[in-house]
Amino acid sequence: MNIIDQVKQTLVEEIAASINKAGLADEIPDIKIEVPKDTKNGDYATNIAMVLTKIAKRNPREIAQAIVDNLDTEKAHVKQIDIAGPGFINFYLDNQYLTAIIPEAIEKGDQFGHVNESKGQNVLLEYVSANPTGDLHIGHARNAAVGDALANILTAAGYNVTREYYINDAGNQITNLARSIETRFFEALGDNSYSMPEDGYNGKDIIEIGKDLAEKHPEIKDYSEEARLKEFRKLGVEYEMAKLKNDLAEFNTHFDNWFSETSLYEKGEILEVLAKMKELGYTYEADGATWLRTTDFKDDKDRVLIKNDGTYTYFLPDIAYHFDKVKRGNDILIDLFGADHHGYINRLKASLETFGVDSNRLEIQIMQMVRLMENGKEVKMSKRTGNAITLREIMDEVGVDAARYFLTMRSPDSHFDFDMELAKEQSQDNPVYYAQYAHARICSILKQAKEQGIEVAAANDFTTITNEKAIELLKKVADFEPTIESAAEHRSAHRITNYIQDLASHFHKFYNAEKVLTDDIEKTKAHVAMIEAVRITLKNALAMVGVSAPESM
């Protein structure tokens, strides 16, 4: 339990003891304490006096006074109590309790903020999963940044997380990729008789793949058409995935599993789920096609599994894939999908219900669109290539840190304008610069302290920390673990980015309000330990969203 929860629990226990001591109730109702909207009204407040009115048969202000008179303020860490309005009790805490967070942060280091106890739940988080047919773009970048941050947050909150990328390597788009490579392969060999397919891929990368294969494997030209296309499918996916993996690694995004759609066919899992759904009575034949009764489970219409020409829809392997996720022992399935996948939510949930799996175990987040902005105007095409701007170009333009930070600043269900000019600014107007500068500034102060012979120590007299800005800063440090818990519970990576901004802001305010290194050696030691706790917290929070914490800027 974190220090904030401990203090709240202690306060509730002491209020209950006070009610008991005052003889106000035999059975004490649920005591709720809240943080007042206005900090002038204390650190916490409760309406318990009004709740007790009918039980105690007394005026609520009178009840409130009885609670105050019988409260052990020392145990409750309370220095002042006010009774307001009809009977609200406002508590002002003795904030020395907050200094306990300093040695805790120093001792835990890079584990500070992490929950000690395992949730005992396995989470499979699938994100990015872009088709291996071209470069990653801004939508994929947002998916990668949010997905990786969410995986870090859930891990810190005590979940067992598996990060997975689903490789769509079995559909028509891969056939088109193979045909496109075939055209470029023969062109490189001087044979222009192979035309590009109607839905082919015309990127420079396909030309390069064709040239490379013509140089390294010219013997492919002698294969039968079937064998040649099979080889181009395999090699095309390998080339594209190698490129995607490289870009994602550079974007500080990593996966535990790369799950191939083709493996579902090879292992017979497609036929397995088809037979199972048929056996359970959820499929039927109509218009020469095979349908799934998803309307039985709140979908707006039934869905086709096998088209009247005998080919599978995309939905069928998706069902097999999600059933495979469940079979692997995952308790929670989280999918991060692009904005064009909104219609998939109900049908995927319905498909799980056909197997008797609670569809609430599947959580789908839709990533809304991102617009790249420069000088107030949307930038749709690369000046260099004339094509859509790639993740690699974004990394080259603004850097990994800025891209990761900006893309996790907003809730994924909201549209976002990515200001590339702001992301490059070395000023405190740039959110990521502002946050990283706070860390670098602390490192600079710690270096000065060390030069003066003052080392960071967890054991110090912290009673000298009385400045209001210092107390507010410590409250923010103490709020790190609850913020991680909240971000994990709501699957909201942007809560961590917002926290980082607040923590950096509180540090800068403290720095501007009070000198860290003073003539008072004890006070200086306490300050040095405190800002080290802030530095650890900042570094851990930045790492959670995949951003570095530089020691100098």
UniProtKB/Swiss-Prot annotation:
UniProt entry keywords in alphabetical sequence: Aminoacyl-tRNA synthetase, ATP-binding, Cytoplasm, Ligase, Nucleotide-binding, Protein biosynthesis
Single biological process term from Gene Ontology: arginyl-tRNA aminoacylation
Similarity comment: family membership: Belongs to the class-I aminoacyl-tRNA synthetase family.
GO cellular component: cytoplasm
SMART domains: Arg_tRNA_synt_N, DALR_1
CDD domains named among the record's database cross-references: ArgRS_core
Segments carrying motif 'HIGH' region: 130-140
Broad class of the protein's primary localization: cytoplasm
Keyword Protein biosynthesis: yes
Pfam families membership: Arg_tRNA_synt_N (PF03485), DALR_1 (PF05746), tRNA-synt_1d (PF00750)
Group of enzyme by EC: ligase
E.C. no: 6.1.1.19
Keyword Aminoacyl-tRNA synthetase set for record: yes
Molecular function (Gene Ontology), one example: ATP binding
Known partners and oligomeric status: Monomer.
The reaction(s) this protein catalyses: tRNA(Arg) + L-arginine + ATP = L-arginyl-tRNA(Arg) + AMP + diphosphate
Annotated protein name in UniProt: Arginine--tRNA ligase
UniProt-listed PANTHER family: ARGININE--TRNA LIGASE, CYTOPLASMIC, ARGINYL-TRNA SYNTHETASE
Gene that encodes the chain: argS
Subcellular location: Cytoplasm
